[in-house]
Amino acid sequence: MRRAGFTLIEMLVAIMILSIMTIVSALVFSSVVNAWEKSVVMVDRMQTADYALGQIVAGLRSAYYPPTGEQKDEWGMALYDNGEGEDPGESDVLEWTKLGSAIIGNKSTLADTVHRVRIWVEEERSKDEPGGLWARVWNNDLDNAEANDRSTDEEPGEEFLLVEDVVGFDCVVQKDPKESDEDGRPKWEEEWATSNQIPFRVKLTFRMKTPEKGDEPLPLLRVVEIPLWDLSQNPRR
């Protein structure tokens, strides 16, 4: 009686099938791990960015306007349009005057004073100074008094990085809630230089770098209504 067994061809086919299954399993596992790692990185970035952008929203809601309506030019809100905000070179610059600890923290010496804030996006300066959303804060009255002790090329106040991995910033403002386009949507303005008024609404679009090179930046949108808009339109006399 002949003993049953595997032929050489059957063994080779079995080994080939096992090899294919091993390779496919390894590829699937690698893809899952890579996707998980990228999602963790992106979630971490989004959480950090969400906190920083929340600070900006709080800072805009804390915009300062004198009750008498006598607004100095150097305290007014200013929006400089540099493009669509797709990259640092085309990103806008926003300045305004505020009260409170938003953006600067409650330990800052400026937290209890009226101070000015500027935000913009910048590329990486060096290994120690990464690119992202930057801010500068200062008090005009205090810095003007200390101007003689400062180099003429040195900007006033303190500069710091708010959040990394922001590669673009676009900002538009709505002057009045009644202003709308033909479709009834808010009419947005790309620039703002009216120092004696505050816009009714500000729309901020930040673009976050994704973990995968070559992917389009992920936009984060914030729309803020400024409480003191009505006071800037109807100052108390």
Predicted regions located by residue number:
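Extracytoplasmic beta-strand-rich oligomerization domains located immediately C-terminal to a leader/signal peptide
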Residues: 26-152
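General secondary-structure edge motif
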Residues: 5-8, 12, 35-36, 99, ...
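Short, solvent-exposed loop/helix junctions and linker helices
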Residues: 2, 46, 50, 156, ...
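Sequence-level motif detector for i,i+2 pairs with an aromatic at +2
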Residues: 89-91, 157, 199
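N-terminal single-pass transmembrane signal-anchor helix
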Residues: 2-29
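Short linear sequence signals and composition-biased patches located at protein termini or domain-edge surfaces
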Residues: 160-237
